[in-house]
Amino acid sequence: QSWQQRACSRARRWSGRIRQLPPRTRRPGFVATRVAPLRIRSLHELPADALLREQLSGQVHFHDTHQLRLDTRQLRSDSLQGLMCDLLQAFVDQPPGGVSGLMRLRNLMVKPLGLRTSHLGCPVSSLLDPSAAQRFAGRFPVLAQRSDADGQHVQIVLGADDKHLRFRSSVALRRVGTHEIELTMATRVSCRNGFGRVYMACIHHAHHHYVVPTMLRAAVGRVMQSDPVTSQAWPARPA
């Protein structure tokens, strides 16, 4: 045999031995499952009972809505209030690098104009506002909030007013099945002047197709489990 044949034969033997080894990433006591990729869809209209509909009563120049469903068996908390807290904390603690890069570029461009700046993506930038009159769960600054009496639907509204526009964003969680929660993130913008309209025309495509979906994937990835656990293993936070 030539040295090439001997090398190939040895490689095949080692490959066979490696494939026979038990997976080391599985933990005893758990059934291995594959987490399905997040499927985010864009809606043309806000849900009929959206709290965001009560915001910006004047003309709305730009809006978008994104929605996805989560499997509660892959979440640390199966209470809607606990999940909302986890998502909002993830928005603050782990903003996606690509979105942060875009925000740094934006800040450099608009700071000389006296506009608001933030290292967080615009939809959630008001989570850093220390002067907010309301706080969700006593922790997170919000403009408005609503929780159904039966605990099946929780909504919060974020946002701010600037020289060129006013924006409002909402995060909503609705229980839609035994093991499913619907997450909806929506934004409405009312422009105050011509510059606001030009500004939104420039950023709307990136906001709709990249910023919001990327923020949602990053936040949901933070609150999901690498291994599914029973709800008893991660007790829900008290409402």
Predicted regions mapped to residue ranges:
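Hydrophobic ligand-binding cavity/cleft-lining segments
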Residues: 25-129
